[in-house]
Amino acid sequence: MTEPLLEMRGVKLEGRSDETWNPIINGVDLTLARGEVLGLIGESGAGKSTLGLAAMGFTRDGVRISEGSVEFDGIDLLKASASVKRGLLGKRIAYVAQSAAASFNPAHRLIDQHVEGPTQHGVMSKAESEADGIELYRKLRLPDPENIGFRYPHQVSGGQLQRAMTAMAMACRPDLIIFDEPTTALDVTTQIEVLASIRDIVEQFNTAAIYITHDLAVVAQMADRIKVLLKGDEVETADTRTMLSAPTQDYTKSLWAVRSFERPLKSPVVASAVPVVSVQNISAAYGRVPVLHDVSFDMHEGRTVAVVGELSLIHI
């Protein structure tokens, strides 16, 4: 049997409140093989992101790993020195955050930030890393891959920036990547495109990945196995097909039921005869670029109008 790349045993984490340490993660086990994607799913506060950081041997300020072990390719990350961890992070272990915009320096071009990791770790020269960056942009389906890296972060869309961050994480060809809800802020269409490109590149490089999310649709597309967390406890773990078709625990079943909209819907409010707000035939432009074309809608008392559209469309 192949040895796991990542193995976490009995991991407990605590958070400090005043002088008291309170439990956050209550003895979770986790194994991950090369090329495998594990989905970590649970509601807000379940401990997903905290466990994801612990998988790299790190914690946020005010959090500690109080029990358990974390081994990456035979290296005990909880006993490893700071220099050993620095050598691993970015080169063999990478992290993709929820906010791509916050992860980039707005004063530097995308490609300049992309080459930092490979050159600092001695993986490639600057020229080699720039050429490889273009190839990664192409694999991640970024438009105009030869030139998009010469733009600044504010000059690309949210979905493009998220893929550029994934390219940066893959630059050193890490063995393990932690994806911490990287598509949460994206619209559905862009999210599907980004997820497909991430899944493709992870498979191409046989990279192990932990994908953290609260979205069942996302985890169904990304994960080979799913681990469900609730308030720091592991609820159940199974391969994706089994988890989606035949969950065993009541909490997991309730998550699936919510996603399936099995709850009764509210009865619609009867619209008032006269709308509170009436917008008719609105058109708008940024300079010479039209952005709204003959838009009309009414808003009635007690009712809500939802405006839905992709990123870069103009919402009223």
Annotate each language-model stretch with its function.
Residues 219-221:
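A short, surface-exposed alpha-helical micro-motif characterized by mixed small hydrophobic
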Residues 171-175:
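A short, proline-enriched helix->beta-strand linker immediately N-terminal to the Walker B motif
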